[in-house]
Amino acid sequence: MAKLSKKAKAIAAAVDKNKLYTVAEAIALVREYATSKFDETIELAVNLGVDPRHADQMVRGVVTLPKGTGKNVRVGVFARGPKAEEAKAAGAEVVGAEDLMEAIQGGSIDFDRCIATPDMMGVVGRLGKILGPKGMMPNPKLGTVTMNVADAVKAAKGGQVEYRVDRTGIIHSGIGKASFSAEDIRANFDALIDALLKAKPAGAKGRYVKKVAISSTMGPGVSIDIADLPAAA
């Protein structure tokens, strides 16, 4: 069995795996032990009391993190004519139509978020098997199939993140960087939790929020006391 490094031992001693921390305590611990040479992402994991195999228990949506994500989000847009120019002016890195489809089919996906005008969905639909598994397929319910491409591009770059429960009932989402202040991480934490509470499906039974944990990319997971969340949780 590999020996623990001094850093790992210090972290193990500082974070009690059997303890539930307040949100403020958890954020402080995660920031303190995010000591890698790169700016680690602060990640939130929320275990929900839903069974996503049932359509009436799916939890999915978008939320704008008020303090941003700390990431440079590259945006790809399927559009033609004036809408293509609008997307470029708004800051989209990749804009195209059939040419963009062919590039993606060839293995080139040079963006993090994908937006399309409604008239382009016939083209985008051919990419379902490629974009779908990556969570990049444009969706009108998420505001990524729209004629308001400028607003959609700006939202994607301005801190908007998509969330979707996985097959085990857990939502995973980045809520900032270790370089963020504790206050900024808390603001983003609150925004995402609020969005998840509002997205509670009618089919959910029993306790909705079962477990919450926060961590950094290379750091330990810190469990949060659900009693420290809004009453609706």
Swiss-Prot record:
GO terms for cellular component: cytosolic large ribosomal subunit. PROSITE patterns: RIBOSOMAL_L1 (PS01199). Gene3D superfamilies: 3.30.190.20, 3.40.50.790. One of its GO terms (biological process) is translation. It holds the Pfam family Ribosomal_L1. Keywords: Repressor, Ribonucleoprotein, Ribosomal protein, RNA-binding, rRNA-binding, Translation regulation, tRNA-binding. InterPro entries: Ribosom_uL1_bac-type (IPR005878), Ribosomal_uL1 (IPR002143), Ribosomal_uL1-like (IPR023674), Ribosomal_uL1/biogenesis (IPR028364), Ribosomal_uL1_3-a/b-sand (IPR016095), Ribosomal_uL1_CS (IPR023673). One of its GO terms (molecular function) is tRNA binding. Belongs to the universal ribosomal protein uL1 family. Part of the 50S ribosomal subunit. PANTHER family: 54S RIBOSOMAL PROTEIN L1, MITOCHONDRIAL (PTHR36427), LARGE RIBOSOMAL SUBUNIT PROTEIN UL1M (PTHR36427:SF3). Binds directly to 23S rRNA. The L1 stalk is quite mobile in the ribosome, and is involved in E site tRNA release. This is Large ribosomal subunit protein uL1. It comes from Zymomonas mobilis subsp. mobilis (strain ATCC 31821 / ZM4 / CP4). The lineage of its organism: Bacteria, Pseudomonadati, Pseudomonadota, Alphaproteobacteria, Sphingomonadales.
